[in-house]
Amino acid sequence: ILALGIFISFRILDIPDLSVDGTFTLGVAVSVMQAFNGDPIKGILLSIVAGAIAGSVTGILITKLNVQPILAGIITMTALYSINLKIMDRPNISLYKKDTIFTMAQKYFGDYYKLAAAGIVLVIAAVLLFWFLKTQAGMSLRATGDNEYMVRASSINSDRMKIMGFAIANALVSLSGAMYAQYSSAGDSNSGTGMLVVG
């Protein structure tokens, strides 16, 4: 899931997004707090929304404020570090004896519950992403990464496409963070370090 998110920004949009480390941890923070309060599914869904918002901020910095992509990613990542600490209210949180989507899946899939839960989420994310890329909006997004000037000549708002691309990419990265937190039954404010390289 992390690789799918990085694939959108680096390969489709052809723009480096260094905010990935912060967005991954954002997914961890949102997911672990919701799971800690007894609603792991809501945690997964909210992490997707939070990641999309963070990605949109990076996109707006690049398109509307003309900030260089690398600097925009660093700005967003730095801001997210403080936001993530505020969400979690402490450096780390344990989900010991708390319900997660994996413990919920154990009731249905037995010994293979972790693999099954992760596989189901991955398949859903991949199918939705590749379906989207075949729609008109998805093709416009791909065209923006290939040739932005031609896209503008075709009266397509390339800035909007970039913002949408960053939103989708970071939503997927945040989702991967949410899954990781519930898989490991713990959330750490530094868990996103190096995720760009991993992806």
Residue ranges and their predicted role:
Residues I1-D39, I44, L61-L65:
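Single transmembrane alpha-helix segments in multi-pass membrane proteins
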Residues K64-M88, S191-G199:
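Pore- or pathway-lining transmembrane helices of multi-pass membrane proteins that form conduits
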